[in-house]
């Protein structure tokens, strides 16, 4: 069984000191069997247009950009099989992978800008 860690914290960004945006990751740890699907949930709040990001930090490595939503298609895919879908009405940007592998063991961070 794999253990994908999703730090349970809230990231808050302030734009020009007048507008606040926040991200909430609801799952702190997500145990998954190898080759099983996984979904890491990310909800945000914002009163303005958003850019959304997923970062990954593998053991003993620095933070790396996994994927980002800037505009256009609501489905964003990464080169390693992960995807995230921007859902404006549900204010979510959940990260998914249909089949995880031991190499996916890491901490995953959602961010908004």
From Swiss-Prot:
Positions annotated with a glycan in the UniProt record: 43, 87
GO cellular component, one term: T cell receptor complex
Subunit description: Alpha-beta TR is a heterodimer composed of an alpha and beta chain; disulfide-linked. The alpha-beta TR is associated with the transmembrane signaling CD3 coreceptor proteins to form the TR-CD3 (TcR or TCR). The assembly of alpha-beta TR heterodimers with CD3 occurs in the endoplasmic reticulum where a single alpha-beta TR heterodimer associates with one CD3D-CD3E heterodimer, one CD3G-CD3E heterodimer and one CD247 homodimer forming a stable octameric structure. CD3D-CD3E and CD3G-CD3E heterodimers preferentially associate with TR alpha and TR beta chains, respectively.
Originating organism: Homo sapiens (Human)
Pfam family, one: V-set
Keywords recorded for this protein, A-Z: Adaptive immunity, Cell membrane, Disulfide bond, Glycoprotein, Immunity, Immunoglobulin domain, Membrane, Receptor, Signal, T cell receptor
Protein name: T cell receptor alpha variable 8-6
Domain of life per record: Eukaryota
GO terms for biological process, alphabetical: adaptive immune response
Disulfide bonds, paired cysteine numbers: 42-110
Signal peptide range: 1-20
Residue intervals of the Ig-like domain: 21-113
Gene: TRAV8-6
Function: V region of the variable domain of T cell receptor (TR) alpha chain that participates in the antigen recognition. Alpha-beta T cell receptors are antigen specific receptors which are essential to the immune response and are present on the cell surface of T lymphocytes. Recognize peptide-major histocompatibility (MH) (pMH) complexes that are displayed by antigen presenting cells (APC), a prerequisite for efficient T cell adaptive immunity against pathogens.
Cell compartments where the protein resides: Cell membrane
């Amino acid at each position: 069984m794999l253990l994908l860690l999703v730090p349970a914290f809230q990231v808050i960004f302030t734009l020009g000191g007048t507008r606040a945006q926040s991200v909430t990751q609801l799952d702190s740890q997500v145990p998954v069997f190898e080759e099983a699907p996984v979904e890491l949930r990310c909800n945000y709040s914002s009163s303005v247009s958003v850019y959304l990001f997923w970062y990954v930090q593998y053991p003993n490595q620095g933070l790396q950009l996994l994927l980002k939503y800037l505009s256009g298609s609501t489905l964003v895919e990464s080169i390693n099989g992960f995807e995230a879908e921007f859902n404006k009405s549900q204010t979510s940007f959940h990260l998914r992978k249909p089949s995880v592998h031991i190499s996916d063991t890491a901490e995953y961070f959602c961010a908004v800008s």
